[in-house]
Regions:
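A short, proline-enriched helix->beta-strand linker immediately N-terminal to the Walker B motif
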Residues: 140-144
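ABC-type ATPase nucleotide-binding domains, specifically the catalytic core motifs of the NBD
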Residues: 9, 49, 81, 85-101, ...
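Helix-to-loop junction immediately C-terminal to a conserved catalytic motif
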Residues: 45
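The feature captures the beta-strand-to-loop junction immediately N-terminal to the Walker
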Residues: 30-32
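Conserved ABC ATPase "signature" region
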Residues: 99-117, 169
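Conserved beta-strand-loop-alpha-helix hinge in the C-terminal portion
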Residues: 201-227
């Protein structure tokens, strides 16, 4: 994205955004409520368009958007379908049919420890289980790009910690590009290869690249990010 701008009713939510996501990279977009991070993700997903600037996709046919899976804050599972049927739901869409394989989709349930839930309905799942299923459903269409909009924010801290480890394993094993929107500094530090901070009016307020096994547990790096993030967020974390 180069010079990305977006406004709603005259209020800027993205202001001159220049950001690149490399193939296979895990990027965390960090920011307070109202910083424009969800709008940025919706633009990447094709659910919103920029008012100005450009969005370019490398190494895709004709520069088209890569095959993309999206998971929002709520799992949005179909309540009348079982977990297995929800996982297979993606094949109903023409854009996904060519890449969708039933055996692969159900294999993901086994591979990531959810096969015991296959016959359950969404109202029989915990919040953490529902979000895992939503992520597997998105992964089942074999996306090159997985977009996650604060998928763990409504869960309690213990469950969030467990799911972060699970997500890191999934992203690494499937080798997909991930953009995660979050307001949680520790979540960003644990998962991301790179952190992009959005500040007021959707401006980039900082960017940090994390080397495996080094920057993630560095208290000075965490303090630096919190300083940029702002005093209010520091209190929350």
């Amino acid at each position: 994205m180069v010079g990305g701008r977006k406004a709603f009713r005259g209020t800027s939510v993205l202001t001159g955004i220049d950001v690149t996501v490399e193939d296979g990279e895990f990027v965390a977009v960090l920011g307070r409520s109202g910083s424009g991070k969800t709008t940025l993700l919706r633009v990447l997903a094709g659910l919103e368009t920029l008012d100005a600037g450009s969005l370019e996709w490398q190494d895709t046919s004709g520069g088209a958007r890569p095959h993309t899976g999206v998971v929002f804050q709520r799992a949005l599972l179909m309540p009348w379908l079982t977990v297995a049927e929800n996982i297979r739901f993606g094949r109903r869409f023409a854009a996904h049919r060519a890449s969708f394989e039933n055996d692969y989709a159900l294999g993901l349930l086994r591979r990531f420890g959810l096969d015991g839930l296959a016959d359950r309905y969404p109202d029989q799942l915990s919040g953490g289980q529902a979000q895992r299923v939503a992520i597997i459903r998105a992964a089942a269409i074999r996306p090159r790009l997985l977009l996650l909009d604060e998928p763990f924010s409504a869960l309690d801290p213990a469950v969030r910690g467990e799911l972060r480890s699970w997500l890191a394993e999934l992203a690494a094993e499937l080798g997909i590009t991930v953009v995660l929107v979050t307001h949680d500094v520790d979540e960003a530090l644990e998962l991301a290869d790179r952190i992009v901070l959005l500040s007021e009016a959707g401006r980039i307020g900082g960017e940090w690249r994390l080397e495996a096994g080094l920057g993630r547990a560095d208290p000075d790096r965490r303090a630096e990010i919190l300083t940029h993030f702002g005093h209010q967020v520091g209190q929350q974390v």
